[in-house]
Amino acid sequence: MAFWKPGTEKPRFEEDGEGGIVFMSNNLASSSSSSYGYANIEKQRQRLPVYKYRTEILYLVENHATTIIVGETGSGKTTQIPQYLKEAGWAEGGRVIACTQPRRLAVQAVSARVAEEMGVNLGEEVGYTIRFEDHTTSGVTSVKFLTDGVLIREMMEDPLLTKYSVIMIDEAHERSISTDILLGLLKKIQRRRPELRLIISSATIEAKTMSNFFNSSKKRHAPEGSTPGPKLEPAILSVEGRGFSVKIHYVEEPVSDYIRSVVSTILLINEREPPGDVLVFLTGQEDIETAIKLLEEEAHSNQKNSSGLLPLPLYSGLSRSEQELIFTPTPRGKRKVILSTNIAETSLTLEGVVYVIDSGFSKQKFYNPISDIESLVVAPISKASARQRSGRAGRVRPGKCYRLYTEDYFLNQMPGEGIPEMQRSNLVSTVIQLKALGIDNILGFDWPAPPSSEAMIRALEVLYSLQILDDDAKLTSPTGFQVAELPLDPMISKMILASSELGCSHEIITIAAVLSVQSVWIIARGVQKEQDEAKLRFAAAEGDHVTFLNVYKGFLESKKPTQWCYKNFLNYQSMKKVVEIRDQLKRIARRLGITLKSCDGDMEAVRKAVTAGFFANACRLEPHSNGVYKTIRGSEEVYIHPSSVLFRVNPKWVVYQSIVSTERQYMRNVVTINPSWLTEVAPHFYQNRQNAMSF
């Protein structure tokens, strides 16, 4: 594998970054790595590129209902703008400044940094809220960080978000479903609350497109004699300057194995380049663990090229202590190699990174409304993501980005922007969120990127089958309203409601809590046999959901839970989180009038409750096949994932929670069922398919 080298004929150098080669700041002498880490916090803040725009930002927010800020990676917009707003008085009189992020890890990291800069305890003046975790103090917290989804749920209690004076939607370019819903809802709220200020912030978003979206609002007519409100036309501000130049290297030929290419590039950097940490973008936990294992093998066989390397994973399922390793200073004589998902593209500032390796791929959700399968697939990234990734280098000195794809591919084949999640996802949760907020005409909702009518119709059909919507596509009472109240996937919520009638709500709420964390299992390198043996200690013949009950029971009964988790390859932090989530769900269930009862070991009741929620995900084993299943809807070919306790068991009928696509479509979290339950729990859904099934 060869790269174009700086100073040779290729790659091209372009000031505007279209080829992604060099990014220059306005004043390269404004920051130095030697003084940056030792300066006090106030001087650090003043050195950030966004600081010289402080007055302009506050003027625009004062005079415009919506301000769109395009700030390059590392400009400081995420941490500084909320502080500027507070300093300017936008949090006086009990008002709150909100800043949303698409990811939970970013919410936690950014809020901690802002609290540190303001010299306050996290959870008091500065706080954060993510699903199942609220670190705010009512009447005290004035700067609040939260996910887009949490802010949407707050609208169920306060439709006009009256406590907020300014809402900043950060990293809007990610275009998650929650971000797009939030943008549409905030546009509606502004018509009723002209005093509400919105800031749309991103590193790459097309500002004019977003401006046109907010500029298309229906004109408000102020009462005669009233004080004129802010201008409706959005203001656009570009915050330039990131610190240091970044040179881009492309491979000369396409690579056949991007994980091995990543490892060889890490070793190349370690052998030839001056000190500086490396940030690697891979697709997910499995890729990251594989790359780390290859690096460790290289360390044993070739110590010269790999000496001093300190590989660290970064993905959303890590414990807090593992996350903190990412942000700690690199030990003397070491080079941190942070192997990350696209979580490191936005918001998280990783000081010390000088080199970036971009695999060119990420995991993305894609939904097929015909087969009704939503898959997590490895897909090429967009130019916008590529620029975000390269922008992570060059924060402490001139940096380099190694792209594991050709320059021709970047310039002529890579798409400019990614497809918004709204246009490639299952919309069941989206529909119920909007219905719960009183929006009946969903097809007429003002979307930044309209979803497909096929996906919307399919979502309405599933919700009708779940008895969440009635014949008029309105929330049913009480089922629909109860499901909307639970902060869970609607299928998991329906599973909980069914458990109340089946007398197994304690068990199903436990399962729901486990499904709400990334994973309770730890994927350790080089000990696959020991891991498999540990999982077998809890394995239940009925499937993964019942296995989760065994894991939870063992955790509660363990006298030394930390050591017990270590011995059984379980994530202690995840298990603690399961206990917390379970307690919260029990409180919500009581408030909703759901009867809490244990089935005392009746696993048929548990499996039936799971089926009541996930009946649309039923599959049947193909006769005389080697583990091939066919979905009842769409007749898609699927397989049980190797991580399931039912792998190689191949029961005749199952339901699954989700599908992950690699070379095959694999079912995750699988449980055995009796096929007769399908028409019992979902007669509307299966009445037209009954003849096609051999019950």
Swiss-Prot record:
Pfam families: AAA_22, HA2_C, HA2_N, Helicase_C, OB_NTP_bind
A single GO molecular function term of this UniProt record: ATP hydrolysis activity
InterPro entries tied to this protein: AAA_22, DEAD-box_helicase_OB_fold, DNA/RNA_helicase_DEAH_CS, HA2_WH, Helicase-assoc_dom, Helicase_ATP-bd, Helicase_C-like, P-loop_NTPase
SMART domains: DEXDc (SM00487), HA2 (SM00847), HELICc (SM00490)
Known EC number: 3.6.4.13
Keyword DNA repair part of the UniProt annotation: no
Keyword Nucleotide-binding: yes
Any one Gene Ontology cellular component term annotated for this protein: cytosol
Stored CDD domains: DEXHc_DHX35, SF2_C_RHA
Role of this protein: May be involved in pre-mRNA splicing.
Name of the protein in question: Probable pre-mRNA-splicing factor ATP-dependent RNA helicase DEAH9
Organism placement in taxonomy: Eukaryota, Viridiplantae, Streptophyta, Embryophyta, Tracheophyta
